[in-house]
Structure formats: C-alpha cells, structure tokens
C-alpha cells in the first residue's frame, strides 16, 4: 500500500514509519509513506503557508497555492488511481467499516489541515473524500492521518504476523473484543477463566463470543441495534445477561 501525506510537520510521521507494526511493514516494503510539505512549494523567503480568511474572523487559513502544488506533486508521484482524503471534523466519521473500505485502496493521499482549515475551493477541486476520527477538535490533521494509516495498514496482507489478529479485533464483526489473559494463571487472587485452560476449542470459541456480545451490550449497546444476531449469538447474549444479573444480585447482597 502506498500513502502520500501532505503536512506542515512531516517529521511527525516517523511515529508511523519507524515504530511498531507499521514501522515493520515499511521495512518489509508492504507499506510506503511519503510526505510533502507545502512549505517546500512556497515562493517567498519566509516560506509563508497561511493567510487571512475573507470576511474576517479569528485565525488563519492554509494558503491555496502551496497546498495545491503539494497535492499535485503527490498525485504525480502516485500515478493513476490515488484517492485524495482531507482529514476534517466535517468528514464522515471513521469506524471499522470505513477502515475496511479504505483498506481496499492501493494508493491514498492524506491532506492534513492546520490553522482554521483550508480554502473550500481546494476541497471542491482536489479532495475526493473527507474523513473525521471523532467529534472533537485537534490542532491539525496529522494525528487523524496517523490513526487512519495505522488502522488500514492492519488489513494489508503480511503486515500482521497473524492475520487472525485483524479478523478478531474489536468492531470487525460489529462487536467489541472479548477479554484476554496471559500468564500468570492467578494474579492478586484473580484467576484466568477455567475454560481458557481447558483446551476445548469449541467451548473457548463460545466463551469468547459470549463475552464479546456481553461486553458490547454493557458498553456499546447501540452497536447491537444494527446487528442481526444468529440464533447462537442471541442465546449466548441471553445467557450473559442472566449471569450478569445474578452476579449483580450477589454483589448487592454482600
């Protein structure tokens, strides 16, 4: 997968290219991240990249010419078929479904805004899609861009040591992930659930599915509203709810 980034702070993306899963993917040649800085496309000695907005108001906007030239340079490097994405609070909110959709693209160009944003005409002429990572304000688009790169790279074949890791992540099937345990078996009087030590893979699968359903019901019940549960899932969720109610009653009596 090839990803181009338009940013005034390209050095921030070393967090993606030099570390962790994405860093290993870059070293293996599975992921390529290239950056273009609009400052490199300015024509004044101060390398100016911001200007005042028409109509007044607080803050500045990114200048059109350096930004457009940087986008055009990235497009030229990408060749045909690159999708240009602007990280924006006004964009579609990123979720796992969106990550899956974007991971199909082999070439992406991510535009990171700064200041109060970018000229609307640049959005109209250069941007294919706008995406947001949530309903809150950040200082720029770099962190959302890194979030996007990290999440979609997990779907690139070979990036993860075990592809099942991506397939079992939270939200992949519309549910939160189940609890996980490693050694020791007992930690401060808290034991690993016996079923995970049983070696019975069918029961382990059922336990994990039940916990995933239950955790979603407890923490993100709205996610269940859009799911058509199978008979097995419905039964397991009912079991979880009964067990949870019994536990609450027991704790209330203590």
UniProtKB/Swiss-Prot annotation:
One of its GO terms (cellular component) is cytosol. It catalyses: guanosine(37) in tRNA + S-adenosyl-L-methionine = N(1)-methylguanosine(37) in tRNA + S-adenosyl-L-homocysteine + H(+). SUPFAM superfamilies: alpha/beta knot (SSF75217). GO terms for biological process: tRNA N1-guanine methylation. Specifically methylates guanosine-37 in various tRNAs. Belongs to the RNA methyltransferase TrmD family. Its EC number is 2.1.1.228. Keywords: Cytoplasm, Methyltransferase, S-adenosyl-L-methionine, Transferase, tRNA processing. One of its GO terms (molecular function) is tRNA (guanine(37)-N1)-methyltransferase activity. It comes from Edwardsiella ictaluri (strain 93-146). CDD domains: TrmD-like. This is tRNA (guanine-N(1)-)-methyltransferase. The gene is trmD. S-adenosyl-L-methionine binds at residues 113, 133-138. It is found in: Cytoplasm. It holds the Pfam family tRNA_m1G_MT. Homodimer.
């Amino acid at each position: 997968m090839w990803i181009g980034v338009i940013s005034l702070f390209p050095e921030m993306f070393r967090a993606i290219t030099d570390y962790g899963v994405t860093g290993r993917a870059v070293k293996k040649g599975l992921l390529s991240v290239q950056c273009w800085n609009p400052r490199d496309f300015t024509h004044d000695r101060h390398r100016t990249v911001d200007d005042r907005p028409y109509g007044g108001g607080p803050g500045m906007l990114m200048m059109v010419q350096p930004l457009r030239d940087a986008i055009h340079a990235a497009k030229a490097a990408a060749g045909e078929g690159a999708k240009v994405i602007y990280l924006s609070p006004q964009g579609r909110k990123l979720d796992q479904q969106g990550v899956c959709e974007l991971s199909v693209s082999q070439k992406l160009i991510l535009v990171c805004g700064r200041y109060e944003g970018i000229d609307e005409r640049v959005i109209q002429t250069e941007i294919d899609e706008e995406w947001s990572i949530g309903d809150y304000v950040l200082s720029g688009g770099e962190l959302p861009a890194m979030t996007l790169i990290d999440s979609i790279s997990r779907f690139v074949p070979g990036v993860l040591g075990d592809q099942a890791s991506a397939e079992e992540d939270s939200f992949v099937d519309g549910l939160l992930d189940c609890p996980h345990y490693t050694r020791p078996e007992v930690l401060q009087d808290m034991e690993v659930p016996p079923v995970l030590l049983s070696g019975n893979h069918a029961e382990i699968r059922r336990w994990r599915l039940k916990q995933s359903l239950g955790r979603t019901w407890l923490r993100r019940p709205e996610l269940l509203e859009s799911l058509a549960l199978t008979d097995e899932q419905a039964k397991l969720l009912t079991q979880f709810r009964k067990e949870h109610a019994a536990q609450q009653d027991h704790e209330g009596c203590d």
